[in-house]
UniProtKB/Swiss-Prot annotation:
It comes from Mycobacterium bovis (strain ATCC BAA-935 / AF2122/97). This is tRNA(Ile)-lysidine synthase. The lineage of its organism: Bacteria, Bacillati, Actinomycetota, Actinomycetes, Mycobacteriales. Its EC number is 6.3.4.19. Belongs to the tRNA(Ile)-lysidine synthase family. Keywords: ATP-binding, Cytoplasm, Ligase, Nucleotide-binding, tRNA processing. The N-terminal region contains the highly conserved SGGXDS motif, predicted to be a P-loop motif involved in ATP binding. ATP binds at residues 33-38. The gene is tilS. CDD domains: TilS_N (cd01992). Ligates lysine onto the cytidine present at position 34 of the AUA codon-specific tRNA(Ile) that contains the anticodon CAU, in an ATP-dependent manner. Cytidine is converted to lysidine, thus changing the amino acid specificity of the tRNA from methionine to isoleucine. One of its GO terms (biological process) is tRNA modification. GO terms for cellular component: cytoplasm. It catalyses: cytidine(34) in tRNA(Ile2) + L-lysine + ATP = lysidine(34) in tRNA(Ile2) + AMP + diphosphate + H(+).
Amino acid sequence: MDRQSAVAQLRAAAEQFARVHLDACDRWSVGLSGGPDSLALTAVAARLWPTTALIVDHGLQPGSATVAETARIQAISLGCVDARVLCVQVGAAGGREAAARSARYSALEEHRDGPVLLAHTLDDQAETVLLGLGRGSGARSIAGMRPYDPPWCRPLLGVRRSVTHAACRELGLTAWQDPHNTDRRFTRTRLRTEVLPLLEDVLGGGVAEALARTATALREDTDLIDTIAAQALPGAAVAGSRGQELSTSALTALPDAVRRRVIRGWLLAGGATGLTDRQIRGVDRLVTAWRGQGGVAVGSTLRGQRLVAGRRDGVLVLRREPV
């Protein structure tokens, strides 16, 4: 039997994803950068359902407007029913990469027409897992990207990057090559070009696939803990003068992993953002190793203030403090 073409592999992945996750949907959007991954996905998506291509111009590189307009024209030629260039302003909070990602997702959310297809591949998933491991980011980060996290859809998480590049060649598409992808100043670039090839060589191949399988297995475990934590939260919640508080005695009775997940959910509901494993464990110690210590500052979108989790009279409280 002839080997399935790259385009056919991508089409099969997109069709399978749609059957599992998007049964009631009849149109979708795709995030298009002009690079080979998103260009190949756009080509396949436009053949399946009415597709709107959304091209985000971050304005961070010389010629970005030309790159975006070229991608828009390609999307229309591939059969997209609409293609729009979305110009965004990238702030400085959390570093340029994080700020660009935040601006990009906000623009896609605002302008999307149905669910949004993102062209993350198995290789991207492997890099995400390695980043999480290296930074000690906790199980949720190591579990990688979710295939379906409405409205975000990642139908290519089981497909190697080499397949999207091959699909572009089969279709005669000229993809934009992002210079950041070869810039060694970026951690992901070095993971992609140095670390993963070395691991493949030392361990005899199959490392990217193994990392992706690890992410899937761990995500299943974290989903279960999330469910248990959601069921446990009402039993630990206490109505306070400044919103929901948590009873430390009720938290103490929970298994460690469940307790920390309850704390995480409580922090997020209270306005925390960008939580790290270190912060969550710091708040957890207010329950399990209470010695009268001060509170734990966590990230938030507050201006001129910071969000601090502390303990008072046997309950965890969230308070705002001036910076």
